[in-house]
Amino acid sequence: MNNVKRTEVVSKRSLANEGTAVMKETYTLREVYINPEHVVCMRSDNLMKRRLAENLLPNDLDQRQEFTKIYINRGHAGLDITVVGSPSLIQNKMFETALEHKREILKG
């Protein structure tokens, strides 16, 4: 299998108070498996870095942590997700996984 396991930052919006139009956004972490063959591009997610500095993300994240927004091809529609880690770290993990997959195929 050539999927890469990462940690995704997931946002959930809800009403801050009953009867008001004020929205509250909370963040959680979850595992996600990404197929590197469907990744279109990756870039730093500075918005999540700001959210971390504002203490809006889960407490178990280090303040030095970086985030990457990954754009995934889904045919005529795309999907973008934010994962924990710098773009270079994420790319290295995807490259390593793709290389391991090719070695498995060559071994037969």
Predicted region positions:
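Anionic N-terminal interaction surfaces
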Residues: 1-18
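Active-site-adjacent substructure of cysteine-protease-like catalytic cores
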Residues: 21-25
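Acidic, Ser/Thr- and proline-rich intrinsically disordered linker/docking segments
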Residues: 1-4, 26-34, 38-108
